[in-house]
From Swiss-Prot:
Gene: PAM17
One annotated Gene Ontology cellular component of this protein: PAM complex, Tim23 associated import motor
Residues annotated as transit peptide in the record: 1-28
Source organism per UniProt: Cryptococcus neoformans var. neoformans serotype D (strain B-3501A) (Filobasidiella neoformans)
Disordered: annotated span: 33-56
Name assigned to this protein: Presequence translocated-associated motor subunit PAM17, mitochondrial
Domain of life: Eukaryota
């Protein structure tokens, strides 16, 4: 009697064991399709470092930064005038005090011409160091934005030039008759000029791409 009962119950036990994996698969499918579930394993094992700019809030707004950038450029331009004349006066005064003997040539050239060229060189040197002096004076008069690690103005400069490099036209397509307009964005002083700069870059890209063979692109 017990043997016959065991033989009748064996198919039922076998059926339960075969349904168990199917139930587990249904449970796994329902849990994975749930919108609130979180995967236990990462989808990718090889993650590459991101080279994009930081997405955090910028220390300055763009209108205020462009206004400060315009002021700094103005300071650099204005200080070039006194430094140029200072180099001219210092160089001219020094070389004028030297005794020039026409019979003694300097590299085969009369001393008067050499001293005159050196005076012009001092004037050019004063013109070149003018923007650096102006930028230094601007930083001293605006310590809240020019100091720090990193300084707010430095962060904005980095972000600004990143956008310039990203949106400007490819210089490989330029020619003597068709030069990239404002390649470094030096004329950008406001949001309106920045939008105009973007339009100019787009127009240049269309002109540069027009008529270029496909194999050269």
């Amino acid at each position: 009697m017990s043997r016959s009962v065991f033989s009748t119950l064996r198919p039922v036990i076998g059926q339960k064991t075969t349904l168990a994996p199917f139930a587990l698969s249904l449970r796994h499918a329902s849990s994975s399709s749930s919108p609130f579930s979180t995967p236990t394993e990462p989808t990718s094992f090889h993650t590459q470092p991101s080279h994009s700019t930081p997405t955090g809030p910028l220390p300055l707004t763009w209108p205020s930064y462009l206004s400060l950038r315009r002021q700094r450029r103005l300071w650099s331009t204005l200080t070039s005038v006194p430094t140029t004349f200072l180099g001219l006066f210092l160089g001219g005064g020094y070389f004028a005090s030297l005794e020039a003997d026409p019979s003694q040539l300097i590299f085969g050239v009369e001393p008067m011409f050499v001293y005159g060229g050196a005076t012009l060189g001092c004037m050019a040197l004063g013109y070149l160091i003018g923007p650096s002096v102006g930028a230094t004076l601007f930083s001293l008069t605006h310590p809240s934005i020019a100091r720090g690690n990193p300084a707010p103005l430095e962060v904005m400069d980095r972000e600004f030039y990143h956008r310039i490099r990203k949106n400007r036209a490819d210089p490989r397509f330029q020619s003597v008759q068709n030069i990239v307009p404002d390649f470094y964005g030096e004329k950008i002083v406001s949001l309106s000029t920045y939008r105009r700069w973007l339009r100019d870059q787009a127009v240049y890209k269309r002109k540069a791409m027009h008529g270029v063979p496909g194999e050269d692109l």
